[in-house]
């Protein structure tokens, strides 16, 4: 009987420790001023020219603002502010070898989303590094070294924006 009582007491203790505090409710619409952008690139191409990091940042800002507006998630007078940090990494074929290529291999994304009210972080999400999947034909194009323009990167930006906005919509 003592063992059962001790076991029951232990289980109740562990259940009590595992419960979390209730989260403060969000306003549902957010104030958004723009992203914090970091561009990572370990190789500077000389044969092909790609869009500048400033252009990539502008595209992210424009598309995120458009998607948030479309989803009716923006309110400039909201008490909740949306802070988004994006790290966009370009990978070039062979960049880690002696046989570097100026053809783009892929795009990687890491992002953080915070909802802040009066300086207090109410929600925080941080992704691991995500690789853009251009599909079967896009991967084949990369394998044969045909990614020498901005099309791969523009598709990656659009897909990444969708991922970020879906994360924001999922924050409750």
Kindly label every feature range from the protein language model.
Residues 22-25, 70-72, 132-172:
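C-terminal/domain-edge helix-coil "capping" segments
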Residues 1-19:
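Sec-dependent bacterial lipoprotein signal peptides
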Residues 63, 121-122, 161:
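Bimodal feature
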Residues 9, 65, 112:
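Short glycine-/small-residue-rich flexible loop motifs, especially phosphate/cofactor-binding loops
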Residues 8, 23-28, 75, 102-104:
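Sterically constrained small-residue positions within well-ordered secondary structures
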Residues 15-71, 167-172:
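A structural "domain/chain start" motif
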Residues 52-56, 60, 105-107, 145-156:
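Extracytoplasmic/periplasmic, Sec-exported soluble proteins
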Residues 71, 76-147:
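Surface-exposed short loop/turn segments
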């Amino acid at each position: 009987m003592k063992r059962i009582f001790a076991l029951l007491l232990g289980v109740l203790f562990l259940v009590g420790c595992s419960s979390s505090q209730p989260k403060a409710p969000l306003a549902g619409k957010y104030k958004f001023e723009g992203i914090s952008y970091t561009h990572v690139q370990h190789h500077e191409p000389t044969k092909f020219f790609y869009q500048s990091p400033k252009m990539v940042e502008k595209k992210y800002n424009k598309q995120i603002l458009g998607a948030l507006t479309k989803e009716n998630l923006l309110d400039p007078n909201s008490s909740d502010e949306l802070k988004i940090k994006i790290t966009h990494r370009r990978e070039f074929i062979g960049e880690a070898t002696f046989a570097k290529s100026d053809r783009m291999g892929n795009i990687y994304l890491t992002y953080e989303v915070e909802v802040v009210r009066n300086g207090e972080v109410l929600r925080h999400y941080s992704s691991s590094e995500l690789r853009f999947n251009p599909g079967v034909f896009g991967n084949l194009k990369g394998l044969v070294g045909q990614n020498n323009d901005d099309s791969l990167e523009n598709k990656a930006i659009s897909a990444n924006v969708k991922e970020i906005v879906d994360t924001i919509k999922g924050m409750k």
